[in-house]
């Protein structure tokens, strides 16, 4: 099947690799423009661009696909490239640009999106993190036929993935990326044989995964310890949960923590104990034990190392 692939981060790169390994013809990739990255803020191509160039695939990087937007010349050039390629399908995974109607209409079989949740739960920008934050027992990937709405298109295929009790967003991301790559390969195989029946998303159970905000990183110790422990996992690695500890001017990043089902024994935010086993923080309900931390400008440290250089 002749495909155009639109995606940007590592999640999308894994799907592109799966499509190429399955033998699909991918003559063109759309991805976000190169961005500054690293300490030197050097312009760096996206993971998808790097994979495409390594495979000898053409790459387009328009800043917008809207013909009436801020970059109409770039959008028109991308449209001309797509029309020359004449794809059967466009596969979209974490691309980062809104697809206008002309884009949805151009491929013979439309545009298919790999979404990292079991729709209609967690439509939107951060489904992996919000599923962990909410305490969901499972999530998954959905292959859907794209329409003009925000993740509202008909579903073609779903794959459920359990969420581990200590699983971080980084770990779940990697698992869902692999599941998404296999799911889109399976969906295209079934689509080619006429074996996929689109299903309308149910009206019940719709939730939205709001984009992550750096302000959310600061742990509010008035909340229950269980909520805070989930946020630590959900925000690992980005934006990274932080907490303020006595004696330190800057917030400390929390990489691992656990909720203890015991009375707080102090006002929210109070340090109840600090030793090699953990730093216990009183919360609005229960105790949050900090297990791995990182000072500003420092390295990640297990708590037994961290407490040697810090005392409340």
Curated annotation (Swiss-Prot):
GO CC terms: cytosol
GO molecular function: methionyl-tRNA formyltransferase activity
Catalytic activity, reaction form: L-methionyl-tRNA(fMet) + (6R)-10-formyltetrahydrofolate = N-formyl-L-methionyl-tRNA(fMet) + (6S)-5,6,7,8-tetrahydrofolate + H(+)
EC assignment: 2.1.2.9
Keywords, ordered alphabetically: Protein biosynthesis, Transferase
Binding site for (6S)-5,6,7,8-tetrahydrofolate: 117-120
Keyword Transferase assigned: yes
Highest rank taxon of the organism: Bacteria
Pfam families, alphabetized: Formyl_trans_C, Formyl_trans_N
PANTHER family the UniProt entry points to: METHIONYL-TRNA FORMYLTRANSFERASE, METHIONYL-TRNA FORMYLTRANSFERASE, MITOCHONDRIAL
Function in brief: Attaches a formyl group to the free amino group of methionyl-tRNA(fMet). The formyl group appears to play a dual role in the initiator identity of N-formylmethionyl-tRNA by promoting its recognition by IF2 and preventing the misappropriation of this tRNA by the elongation apparatus.
Sequence similarity: Belongs to the Fmt family.
Protein name: Methionyl-tRNA formyltransferase
Name of encoding gene: fmt
């Amino acid at each position: 099947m002749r495909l155009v692939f639109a995606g940007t981060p590592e999640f999308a790169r894994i799907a592109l690799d799966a499509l190429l390994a399955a033998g699909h013809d991918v003559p063109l990739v759309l991805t976000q423009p190169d961005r500054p990255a690293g300490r030197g803020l050097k312009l760096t191509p996206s993971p998808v661009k790097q994979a495409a160039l390594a495979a000898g695939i053409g790459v387009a990087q328009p800043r917008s696909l809207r013909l009436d937007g801020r970059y109409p010349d770039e959008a028109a050039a991308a449209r001309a490239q797509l029309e020359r390629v004449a794809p059967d399908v466009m596969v979209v995974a974490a691309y980062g640009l809104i697809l206008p109607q002309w884009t949805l209409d151009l491929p013979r079989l439309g545009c298919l999106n790999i979404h990292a949740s079991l729709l209609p739960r967690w439509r939107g920008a951060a489904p992996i993190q919000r599923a962990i934050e909410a305490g969901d027992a499972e999530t998954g990937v959905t292959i859907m036929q794209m329409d003009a709405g925000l993740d509202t298109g008909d579903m073609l295929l779903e794959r459920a993935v359990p969420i581990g009790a200590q699983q971080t967003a980084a770990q779940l991301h990697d698992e869902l990326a692999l599941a998404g790559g296999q799911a889109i390969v399976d969906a295209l195989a079934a689509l080619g044989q006429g074996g996929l029946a689109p299903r309308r998303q149910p009206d019940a159970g719709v939730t939205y995964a709001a984009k992550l905000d750096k302000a959310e990183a600061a742990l509010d110790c008035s909340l229950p310890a269980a909520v805070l422990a989930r946020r630590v996992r959900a925000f690992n690695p980005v934006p990274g949960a932080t907490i303020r500890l006595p004696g330190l001017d800057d917030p400390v990043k929390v990489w691992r923590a656990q909720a203890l089902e015991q009375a707080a024994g102090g006002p929210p935010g109070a340090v109840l104990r600090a030793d090699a086993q953990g730093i216990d923080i009183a919360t609005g309900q229960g105790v949050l034990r900090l297990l791995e931390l990182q000072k500003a400008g420092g390295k990640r440290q297990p708590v037994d190392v961290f407490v040697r250089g810090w005392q409340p």
